[in-house]
Design a protein with these regions (language model features):
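Acidic, polar-rich low-complexity tracts and alpha-helical solenoid repeat scaffolds
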Residues: 1-127
């Protein structure tokens, strides 16, 4: 349940704030990372379900949650790629290319040559 995971993260963070030097700090940090990763994975799964239903705008919202809230998880790049795919599947090729360009300019994201190549292939293959 996402609400209970979010509540747990909040409570663990509160513990870390109250007891920064605790011997349990490392375990608490690991638990937060694990819970955030689970929440990101759930949003990715929701996005994939929307894609299957051809509800691309809803899928994009799910992927944006990963990008905006769970940017520090392993799903960050996948979420960006899936937004590009959703735009391409809606024949919004120019928007997909602009999204990639904006991503390249964003200081927080690292767009590798491999990612860019894959994104351009996704745009070409899905539009």
């Amino acid at each position: 349940d996402q609400d209970s995971s979010k509540k747990a993260i909040s409570q663990i963070q509160e513990f870390l704030d109250d007891y920064p030097g605790s011997e349990h700090s490392k375990d608490a940090d690991k638990l937060i990372i694990e819970l955030r990763t689970r929440l990101a994975e759930k949003s990715m799964e929701t996005g994939k379900l929307y894609v299957k239903l051809k509800a691309y705008d809803s899928a994009i919202v799910s992927y944006e949650i990963v990008i905006n809230e769970y940017y520090d998880t392993k799903f960050f790049n996948d979420a960006n790629m899936e937004i590009i795919r959703c735009l391409a599947l809606q024949n919004k090729k120019d928007e997909a290319k602009q999204f990639l360009t904006d991503l390249e300019k964003n200081e927080q994201s690292v767009v590798t040559d491999s990612f860019k190549e894959q994104a351009l292939s996704v745009i070409k293959d899905n539009s």
